[in-house]
Amino acid sequence: MKKRNRLKKNEEFQKVFKKGQSMANRQFVIYQLDQPNQDELRLGLSVSKKIGNAVMRNRIKRLIRQVFLEEGHKLKQEKDYIVIARKPASELTFEETKKSLQHLFRKSAVYQQQPKKSS
């Protein structure tokens, strides 16, 4: 994931938290905010120290980034996303992480509409 596709600054995070919409399941919370003047999606990650040591937190962040790499082309691009990992996320494999995030993507309707094929 390129640096320009990441949320880094506290102000950027606060803007998404205050003005964005959230959706959650047991493992993750996703905040999303429309950014109409932006071409590509941006991703911010938050993994609390309560979840585990640095190795565990970095592993979770790598898994989330990989899911966004694989699914990113299907998501609405003109948005900022923040993913907050909850404690149960530390026990997930990559496939389970992907499934959990896909569930949230469907629930929050962030997949791009596919053009219907006409017969």
Curated annotation (Swiss-Prot):
Key words of the record: Endonuclease, Hydrolase, Nuclease, RNA-binding, tRNA processing
Cell cycle recorded as keyword: no
Cross-referenced SUPFAM superfamilies: Ribosomal protein S5 domain 2-like
InterPro entries per record: Ribosomal_Su5_D2-typ_SF (IPR020568), Ribsml_uS5_D2-typ_fold_subgr (IPR014721), RNase_P (IPR000100), RNase_P_CS (IPR020539)
Catalytic activity: Endonucleolytic cleavage of RNA, removing 5'-extranucleotides from tRNA precursor
Listed GO CC annotations: ribonuclease P complex
Gene3D superfamilies assigned: 3.30.230.10
GTP-binding found in the keyword field: no
Assigned EC number: 3.1.26.5
A Pfam family that the UniProt record links to this protein: Ribonuclease_P
Function: RNaseP catalyzes the removal of the 5'-leader sequence from pre-tRNA to produce the mature 5'-terminus. It can also cleave other RNA substrates such as 4.5S RNA. The protein component plays an auxiliary but essential role in vivo by binding to the 5'-leader sequence and broadening the substrate specificity of the ribozyme.
Family, as annotated: Belongs to the RnpA family.
Subunit structure: Consists of a catalytic RNA component (M1 or rnpB) and a protein subunit.
Protein name (Swiss-Prot/TrEMBL): Ribonuclease P protein component
Source species of the chain: Bacillus pumilus (strain SAFR-032)
Gene name per UniProt: rnpA
